[in-house]
Amino acid sequence: MELSTAAKNPRNAKSPKKVVVFDYGFGNVRSAERALARTGADVEITRDFDKAMNADGLLVPGVGAFAACMRGLKEARGDWIIGRRLSGGRPVMGICVGMQILFARGIEHGVETEGLDEWPGAVEPLQAEIVPHMGWNTVDAPADSELFAGLDADARFYFVHSYAVHDWSLDVHNPLLRAPKVTWSTHGKPFVAAVENGALWATQFHPEKSGDAGAQLLTNWIGTL
């Protein structure tokens, strides 16, 4: 059997990308770990500061209440880690509440909690007859999306949430800056389903639970690291 060039010369083989799933107590860390490992990444679940800072990619899952997730994130110094990584252009990806906490604030039961304020906007209760939004749904991604590259327009992703961002208010007027790419979905009223903003990407849905479509999406992210 003929060996590939990389197999003949191991120094030519690419090392797998190191990804840390940040473990701050609020997330499906094991399912995220398994899904990322299937892309070929070297994955570790940890809250270790140095490992989270030095990984090729940092994935921040999130399940539960916005306020509780923010408390857990701050206790684990995750807010500082995310900020430092982004200031250095190091990739970060948020999932579900891990996306929501990237916005300016969350409003639950009339109580407002400050988020990380990477993007303006409020996470509010879904405006729909049936809440939570639980199950499979399509998304409307920009034509030049890197996150959804190779995916059909009718690809479906798995959502479980009662809160969402309904209004995107970040406008970029400087021609030297690239505007974020925003993907939408609809449950009652349209809401933000994903954002691609330089080194910071995020999804409201769970790619780790979204079958082949989710696997392709995670592969796309790993490919940018």
Language-model features, listed with the residues they occupy:
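Short, surface-exposed beta-strand/loop micro-motifs that present aromatic residues
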Residues: 184, 189-196
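Short acidic/histidine-rich motifs immediately flanking catalytic phosphotransfer sites
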Residues: 52-62
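Cysteine-nucleophile active-site neighborhood
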Residues: 64-136
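Acyltransferase
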Residues: 2, 7, 199-225
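Short acidic low-complexity segments
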Residues: 43-54
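Pocket-forming structural segment of enzyme catalytic cores
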Residues: 104-187
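Extreme N-terminal starter segment of soluble prokaryotic enzymes
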Residues: 14-20, 200
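N-terminal beta1-alpha1 ligand-phosphate binding loop
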Residues: 19-40, 208
